[in-house]
Amino acid sequence: MLRFMPVGDSMTIGSAGEHTWRHRLWQLLRGTYDPAVTLVGPRETLYDQQTGAPTSLDYADPDFPRAHLAGWGEGWLHMAPLIGDAIRDCRPDVLLVSLGLIDLGFYTNAEQTAENVRAFITAARAADPCVRMVLLPVIPNVRAESDAPFADQVALFNVLLAKAVADLDEPRSPILLASPPPSYDIHVDTYDGTHPNASGEHRIAEAFAGAMREAWGIGRACVARTV
C-alpha cells in the first residue's frame, strides 16, 4: 500500500463544501491501482471562507483519507521548513506537490521560488532519503491571464522547476514533473479563475495520476470526469 501526501496551497486544501482534487485522486488510484491506497499528512481540514480560517471538515464527501499538508496562502517558502517533520511524522512514500502561485504572487520572484523548491527537496530527503515526489507546475490562473509581468514570472518559474527536477532527480528518490492538465480552462475548470471546480479537480488529479502511471506504472488510464 502506497502512502501519498498532498502538499499545496488553496487549490489543494480546498474550501468548505468541496470534494478537492485530493479526493478525486484517491478515488482514481483506488479504482485503477490499489483499493488500499491512502493519503497522509499532518492536517485534515478545509478552509472556511466565511471565517477565513482552515477549520472546516465540511467535505462534499468526507468518507476518504482527508490528511494533507496544504494551506490557504502557503507556498514553497512556507512548506520547505515544514516538510521534514511532516515526512518523519506521517511516513509518506510519495509527495504530490502543487505550489508556486502564492510564492510568485506575494513573496518571491521566479528565481527565489526555485531556490525554495530546492530547499524543500533537500529537507524532504533529509527526512527520508528514498521519498518520491511528483511536482506540478503552476497552472493557468486569472492573474496570469491579465498581468503580463506576472505571467512571465510564472513561465520562468515553470522552466526553473523543470530544471530543478532534472538536476535533482535520482534513482533512490525519483522526482517527476507532472504535465499541466491538458486543455485546462480557467473559465470552465475553476469557479473564480484560480480555484478548481469539479472538472478542475478531476483534471488536476489526472495530471498527478498520469505522471505516475507513465513513469512508475501506478494505475491505468481512465475516462476523464467532470462531476
What is the meaning of each model-derived region?
Residues 32-44, 132-136, 177-178, 219-223:
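Surface-exposed patches in mature extracellular/periplasmic domains of secreted proteins
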Residues 5-7, 189-227:
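Histidine-centered active-site loop/cap adjacent to the catalytic His
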Residues 12, 26, 30-34, 88-91, ...:
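Sec-exported extracytoplasmic/periplasmic mature domains
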Residues 4-5, 11-115:
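Conserved SGNH/GDSL esterase-like catalytic core that processes O-acyl groups on lipids
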Residues 80-91, 167-196, 201:
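N-terminal hydrophobic signal/anchor transmembrane helix of membrane proteins
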Residues 81, 105-120, 144-157, 190-199:
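Active-site cleft segment of glycoside hydrolase catalytic domains centered on the general acid/base Glu
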Residues 140-179, 198-202:
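Substrate-gating cap/lid alpha-helix
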Residues 98-105, 121-156, 179-184:
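Active-site segments of SGNH/GDSL-like serine hydrolases
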